[in-house]
Design a protein with these regions (language model features):
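Serine-hydrolase catalytic machinery in alpha/beta-hydrolase-like enzymes
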Residues: 2-73
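Gly/Ala-rich beta-loop-alpha elbow adjacent to hydrolase catalytic centers
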Residues: 81-90
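Hydrolases whose catalytic domains are alpha/beta-hydrolase-1, hotdog thioesterase
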Residues: 89-93, 114
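Short, conserved loop/helix-junction motifs that constitute active-site signature segments
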Residues: 97-98, 113-120, 139-142
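A conserved short beta-strand
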Residues: 98-110
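Short beta-strand/loop motif that positions the catalytic acidic residue
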Residues: 124-126
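Conserved loop-alpha-helix segment in the C-terminal half of the alpha/beta-hydrolase fold
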Residues: 133-145
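Catalytic histidine-centered segment of alpha/beta-hydrolase-like enzymes
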Residues: 151-162
Length: 185
């Protein structure tokens, strides 16, 4: 039976998330996948879906609401892949008891404000040009390693090269499936 993988979107949810289909395409043959739209987890219902309005809604209660809903929905230990705000949601839910086998966070910048980490295996990936990525001193303080990809910004997770990297990382970490390479003859 396949391992369960829960994917939690960035703040835009499925609305601007066509890139998420690439992750699903790569990973669905290896995992039993559940997808959560961060806006739906947070019960956001905004008249104007501007970046500022969405961000403020998450910061002022939406993240906490999403954490509570995720805790109610997921009871069995599984793996998580989360993007930006979605990563903050899973990070905080894991600290409150969400059963997490592993957490792969991509561009989760708000966790830089946290002074403690969940007691689960965490992978952190950021773009070097992401203005709000955590500092190395923060990662050192929490005993975490951050992977930083040069020449990428906050939305690196929507780039096909990064999508392939993240999917391969997950496959190697979780399923222990090594990539097949053709030998030169």
């Amino acid at each position: 039976m396949a391992e369960k993988l829960v994917i939690v979107s960035d703040m835009w949810g499925a609305r601007k998330g066509l890139w998420i289909t690439s992750y699903l395409g790569y990973l669905q043959q290896y995992f039993d996948i559940t997808f959560y739209d961060s806006q739906q987890l947070a019960n956001l219902d905004l008249t104007v879906n501007s970046e500022e309005n969405i961000h403020n809604s998450f910061v002022h209660g939406g993240i906490d609401t999403a954490v509570a809903h995720l805790l109610k929905k997921e009871k069995a230990p599984c793996h998580y892949l989360a993007f930006s705000t979605g990563g903050t949601i899973v990070w905080n839910a894991a600290k409150k008891g969400l059963p997490v086998k592993s957490l792969y966070n991509v561009s989760s910048t708000r966790i830089r404000m946290e002074n403690d980490k969940p007691a689960v295996p965490v992978t952190l990936l950021y773009g070097a040009n992401d203005t709000f990525k955590p500092e190395e001193t923060w990662a050192d303080m929490l005993g975490l390693e951050m992977q930083v990809m040069p020449n990428y910004g906050h939305t690196l997770y929507s780039d096909e090269k990064v999508i392939k990297k993240v999917c391969l990382d997950l496959l190697q970490q979780v399923t222990k499936v090594a990539p097949t390479t053709k030998k030169a003859v």
